[in-house]
Amino acid sequence: MEQKILTTIHQQILEAKKNGQKLLAILLDPDKIVWENLDHLLLKINQSPATHIFVGGSIVESTIIEDLIAQLKQKTRLPVVIFPGDPSQISPKADAILFLSLLSGRNPDYLIEYQVQAAPILKKTNLEVISTGYILIESGNETAVARVSKTEPLNRENFDLALATAQAGEMLGSKLIYLEAGSGAKKPVPLEMISVISQNVEIPIIVGGGIVDLHGIKKAYNAGADLVVIGTAFENDSHFFDS
């Protein structure tokens, strides 16, 4: 029964896309969590419209991720999905993991090497593994993921290249496309880029980075995002959704 539950997250995302239901993930970076405030934070998450919790960061110790996920599983009913920065960020306590391949860059570590390292570990867990084409988009400032991965994001005005990259990911077998402006981005992913990609790929589109208010979430949805990720804005203001 447990395995059946754990293998439904991707299917739920597909069903939501089919039915026009928009999804929302709150991204928690364990490195930025103030543990004394965790209960209050989880209360706010439980009161929010969030449908998923993503956990991860560019540089996070695996033990910290384990501890946070354990707390989340105890105190929320939302699916907990690992958003890994490297192969050490794997915990069997989560429900699923985004199996990321950084398609916007040409660093082989983030295209395939870390995936090779992670595969044998993941095979020993019951985690639902969701293949995800990860595409960094220029956002007006250097973000942590660009710095750590030593890759350049795609030009935010080059819609053709962004679309071709997303389509390549789809053809390679990605189940999701994740358009990422980056944590603390000055500018979100361009709405026209979201629209062009969502109209020309069949798989669900995740959009994150640089979205600072509810209006920004709505605009991303209207452009074609199936799931929006909020991280820094919620970290900075746990009352983000109160308005």
Curated annotation (Swiss-Prot):
Homodimer. Its cofactor is Mg(2+). This is Geranylgeranylglyceryl phosphate synthase. It comes from the Bacteria. Keywords: Lipid biosynthesis, Lipid metabolism, Magnesium, Metal-binding, Phospholipid biosynthesis, Phospholipid metabolism, Transferase. GO terms for cellular component: cytoplasm. Prenyltransferase that catalyzes the transfer of the geranylgeranyl moiety of geranylgeranyl diphosphate (GGPP) to the C3 hydroxyl of sn-glycerol-1-phosphate (G1P). InterPro entries: GGGP/HepGP_synthase_sf, GGGP_HepGP_synthase, GGGP_synth, IGPS_HisA/HisF. The keyword Isomerase does not apply. It comes from Flavobacterium johnsoniae (strain ATCC 17061 / DSM 2064 / JCM 8514 / BCRC 14874 / CCUG 350202 / NBRC 14942 / NCIMB 11054 / UW101). NCBIfam families: GGGP (TIGR01769), GGGP-family (TIGR01768), PRK04169.1-2 (NF003198). Belongs to the GGGP/HepGP synthase family. Group II subfamily. One of its GO terms (biological process) is glycerophospholipid biosynthetic process. One of its GO terms (molecular function) is imidazoleglycerol-phosphate synthase activity. HAMAP family: GGGP_HepGP_synthase. Sn-glycerol 1-phosphate binds at residues 178-184, 209-210, 231-232. Its EC number is 2.5.1.41. Mg(2+) binds at residues 29, 58. It catalyses: sn-glycerol 1-phosphate + (2E,6E,10E)-geranylgeranyl diphosphate = sn-3-O-(geranylgeranyl)glycerol 1-phosphate + diphosphate.
